[in-house]
Amino acid sequence: MARLYQCPRCGFQVTPQERARDRFCPKCGTYLRPAEGGGGEGWRRVFPYEPYPQQVEFMGDVESTVVSGGTLVAEACNGFGKTVAALSCLLPTGRPIVYATRTHEQVAQVLREVEAINRARSAGHRAVNLASRRLLCVNDECRLLPLRDAQEVCRRLRSRGECPYESDLDRVPRGLPPVLGVRELVSQARRRGVCPYYLSRKLASKVEVVVAPYPYVFNPSIRRLTGLDLEGKFLVLDEGHNVDQVGQEVLSDSLTERTLAAATQEVQQLQRPTQPLEGLRGYLEEACRGSPRLIAPGELAQELEEALGASIPRVLDEYAPLVERVREAKQSKGQAPICYLNGVLIFLELVEESPRESYVGLFHTTPSGAPLLEYRCLDPSLAVAPLVEEAHGVLVMSGTLSPLETFTRVVGLEGAVVKSYPPIQRSDRIKMTIDTRVTTAYRERTKAMIRRLGKSVEEAAQQVDHGVLVFFTQKGFMKNCLAEWTKAGIVELRRGAPHLAGKRVFLEGRDAQHNQRVVEQYKRAAVTPGGAVLFSVFRGRNSEGSNFPGDQARGVVLVGVPYANYGDPLVKAQIAYFNRVRRGLGNQWYTMDAFRAANQSLGRGIRGRDDWCHYWLLDRRYHQHLDLISEWAKGQGPQVV
């Protein structure tokens, strides 16, 4: 790695290029000197455990690439210790870290690792969780409102002195714990009479590690509002396989007939002209009739202006001043100051200002039949590139990034250092069987094939004790399989409950709360001598973010390959867009997307170094694309039957 320079007073490290611009520490003004040992292996002063060789390799790459100001895309298996290893490399530099992740469970894991480092090294590294008002606000008047409305209500309450919690913090209160999650922020702030939300924002500019959900990092407006500056900082994108989807979601928007109706009513109550909104509502209702329809952005903008009866910029100028009046009018009546007009204007502004060659519009309806217009970003690099340009160094890491070359092309990180690391589990603790006798390909999805799949699932469940996870391509297909397997006697009903190979079968819940209860019941049954089976779907609640350690998942069965619906207009548009960017990239993306979902489900079965699992991949197409299966899942090589 390039020789680093370090402040002898506070330990802050800089690259040679940064020192050439300024020879004094940007934090304390002390003259910068060459780091001892060239600046490498600083992690040895911080890492709280005895490292495995694979972790040493990973940390060496983080230091040589990310610390030096580059971008590293790293794939390493579940249980690898990626979080603590990354923190151990970056903390010694003294440079702030923004750590972005997907779920609250993953946020808590990052904070626990900082605490583990502090305990093991008697250190005082500080970390804070940036979270939404919904989690941190303790004023009921605004905490449950949508983001944009909550911001405005909060501003108004503070300007009028009507919020009892202090938000203008000149300095950070003394005596705070070094690591602050949501619960600690709320309790500590309440005790001091300050606002937890603004306390977290104040701390974010002072601490070494800021842990934030993905939208806080990817959404430019949220970054501005929260003061989350990436310049000169390390950026860690954990669960990096989500980067493309999250980036596209942040840069996309939708418009519903319900929103337009509510916005029209808001403007009516202010006694202002509603013709543009009424014209837009009629246009949306007409355009969404029939089958889903794609529309090019330029054509969409033209049709929107015809429906509005004016140019989009003129409509924005005319109606933007009404947003504040709508909120004030609602609040004066004791109503929640949600402004639907603002949502319409934000949608129109996106259509007007977006790079149209990277977008597409889609007219369709919601499941309840309501008209819906989506304006979809097709290029995830539009969200990723600004982050990489602003941050000092970037680490994108996940257990499921394969195929790495396609992933980096899709997200625009072709200049990054890319690496996949060996698993920390012994290869003989991971077994894989690929059944080429079966497939879920639509043309071959006969009753006989479904029963053959059922026999394969039954054989898998018989071969391992305790818990078995079974993933299906779609919920409807899962229910069809269960019905057909019950008819064939593969699944038996015992006291009204389905059983497979003597194990009780549980089905993924219909919503988050129901699923949580189902998973808890499954886990209790899985660790008993009789064991249990959990039926779930790829890309569902149990395929990502859920943990099934030890006996909770001794077997994982993939029934089919989770290709996206090729008939979906947005899928077709995405394939066509990537094919325009680079010949064949769209088709590569389509396959990568399926195998990424499969790899993510495989990851539920291995949660630590001493864990073990047997994988069954029930579809001949897995054998045709062996190179797309994450290396850590292959053990000593798949057995093909």
Regions found by a protein language model. Name each.
Residues 37-73:
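Conserved pre-motif I regulatory segment
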Residues 39-53, 94-210, 218, 278-285, ...:
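A substrate-engagement module of RecA-like helicase motors
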Residues 67-86:
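Walker A/P-loop
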Residues 92, 105-112, 192-209, 213-314, ...:
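Signature of the SF2 helicase/ATPase Hel1-core->accessory helical subdomain module
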Residues 185-208, 220-227, 318-440, 444-449, ...:
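A contiguous, basic/glycine-rich beta-loop/short-helix subdomain that forms a polymer-engagement track
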Residues 436-448, 506-621:
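Conserved RecA-like P-loop NTPase helicase motor core
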Residues 438-473:
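Conserved interdomain hinge at the start of the Helicase C-terminal
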Residues 473-509:
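Conserved helicase motor "Helicase C" RecA-like lobe of SF1/SF2 P-loop NTPases
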